[in-house]
Regions:
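C-terminal binding/interaction regions
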Residues: 21
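N-terminal intrinsically disordered, cationic/polar leader segments
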Residues: 1-14, 27-65
Length: 65
């Protein structure tokens, strides 16, 4: 079994409101989940206008060569 995690921080300079930021982050979270089947969530900076932190996690039962 293999577990992978990743946390990254985004700078969103075009975001003019928290509503803009939430729209961008939600879209990114949904696309990452659908395309790569990852667990994805906004993990920090919820109330900051132009910053977001995204966390990813994946578990693979069998690692192939």
């Amino acid at each position: 079994m293999m577990v992978g995690i990743c946390v990254f921080e985004l700078h969103l300079p075009a975001s003019r409101s928290l509503k803009d930021k939430r729209r961008v982050v939600k879209s990114m979270v949904e696309r990452l989940h659908q395309r790569f089947r990852l667990s994805v969530a906004e993990t920090d900076h919820h109330d900051l206008l132009q910053r977001a932190e995204i966390g990813l996690a994946a578990v693979v039962a069998e690692v192939g060569s």
